[in-house]
Amino acid sequence: MTLFILTETSAGYALLKAKDKKLLKRDDLATEAATAEGVSNLVKLKSFQKFDSAAAALEEVASLVEGKVTPRLASLLDEIKDEKKVSLAVADPKLGNAIGKLPGLDIQLIADSTTADIYRAIREHLPTLIPGLLPQDMSTMSLGLSHSLARHKLKFSPDKIDTMIVQAIGLLDDLDKELNTYAMRVKEWYGWHFPELAKILNDNIAYARLVLKMGMRSNWETSDLAEILPEELEGPVKAAADRSMGTEISQDDLENIQALAEQVVGFAEYRQQLAGYLTARMNAIAPNLTALVGDLVGARLIAHAGSLTNLSKSPASTIQILGAEKALFRALKTKHDTPKYGLIYHASLIGQATGKNKGKMARVLAAKASLGIRVDALADWEDDATEEDKAALGTEARYNLERKLAAMEGKPLKPRGVAIAPNGASAQPKKFELNEARKYNADADALSSDEPKSKKDKKLIEEVSDEEMADADSDEEPAANGTKDDDSSDDSEEEKSKKHKSKKGKDAELEKLAERAGLSLKRYKRKLERGEITFDADGNPTAVSKKDLKKAKKEAKKASKGDEKKRKRSDDGEEVDNAEKKQKKKKKKGEE
């Protein structure tokens, strides 16, 4: 079988013919092809098609990189159509598959590792195989073609178009962190001079602008704060500046604080500009995705996937949990429930849903978003297509999802075209307002002197005295619960005095018994409760230790066990006697 070798160069296509049909199976191929003479003895030039210009060379090589067969290459391969039993060696397997699909070309393609040695030798000694090709010209053409190819990839790569979105959303997140850090530093720094301002003014940007406008708090009389603050806050700020308890600072300190405040204001203005730029880029590149989930969530999805093309290749289930990979793998490892949503959770449609409907909306929204992303990434729009036409799929899908969500939540359906806020209400533009910070409510303070006397004198822990149980023979009856009249108050006082006297008498008896036992009253009571006090025939108490009690319990257990064993032995002896009697009776019957 005749072997042909296809070689792509910066100058053109070369088709080489092997002199040995079993060239690729030789063991000494690497040593034979080490020199130019050895390569010339192994292969010879069959045909060579030169590129007409640098632009043509760029077009041909760009097609080869994508695995496409160009008309120029197809015409070169037509020269070996008529030959029988032909094999063709190709360096790129992707290109080999494309050549194999050409109609009317019955050849055996070889695109594996066996061709590596011969291709290495051909590239090293290419000028000796192609007549009229100088090594200097070859290197110049290779360098120019590589530069053109790199420029072409950077300019026309579809993955590079959305790089602006990836970088913009990353910068937006960084700006938010830096802006928050700088604003907190301004508040802490200027708070030494004017601490009351932070309690009145919540907005960080307005705070920084006020620092730049007023400077020292003593300038409150001459400062016009109407451009920064509304009327309801301007008065409290000036009043607080008049009676502020802050420390004095030097002019040098104020200049440094104002320099930092300028950075805060500058960052805030640039962040607003960057957010507008990101919205415009998202509407231009991914209009359907933006219509469904918003510009910020859509940009984060694209940044997480790497590019719009990579995101379009993902199924709806992947888009739904994109950004929650750590929770997903932890759930799979511990065999728990997997997360229902990732970055898509921050979309307004999911924010409007409540309870179990959040998971349902996340699933449906991810399915619609996957369709919209594929349209954004792969659709070829005409030049006269409007933005409404490009975003028609996303707009229609969002309208249907809003109606579905309203049906799930049991809410009235909104008219078409009405924007819906995350809380489910119709979104309307609001006037910018600066809310006053919450102040400390001094009226809610309560002093100990303000409390009623009964509450003040009341103890935290009340000791309830033990009441003596009345004897069954006694004629006294317990007092009934409920309201008492004035006439019964005297009787209750008498009863209390009687109980107090009886308690004193009982304590006196216990003291006498404790003295006989040689113990204190508290210890005697404790031992009496535990059962460690025994009385003899005369009624004299004696204290028993815990060890003696344990020994007595053990001896009682042993005695009970011994009785059980004796019973078992006696039962066993009776059974043996009965068995012997039965055997004797059987013997007598046998003798008879």
Curated annotation (Swiss-Prot):
It is found in: Nucleus, Nucleolus. Residues 582-592 have a biased composition (Basic residues). Residues 450-462, 505-515, 557-571 have a biased composition (Basic and acidic residues). Pfam families: Nop, NOP5NT. One of its GO terms (biological process) is snoRNA guided rRNA 2'-O-methylation. Residues 443-592 are annotated as: Disordered. Residues 463-478 have a biased composition (Acidic residues). Residues 285-410 form the Nop domain. Coiled coil: none annotated. SMART domains: NOSIC (SM00931). GO terms for cellular component: box C/D methylation guide snoRNP complex; nucleolus; small-subunit processome. PROSITE patterns: NOP. Keywords: Nucleus, Ribonucleoprotein, Ribosome biogenesis, rRNA processing. InterPro entries: Nop56/Nop58, NOP58/56_N, Nop_C, Nop_dom, Nop_dom_sf, NOSIC. It comes from the Eukaryota. One of its GO terms (molecular function) is snoRNA binding. Belongs to the NOP5/NOP56 family. Required for pre-18S rRNA processing. May bind microtubules. This is Nucleolar protein 58.
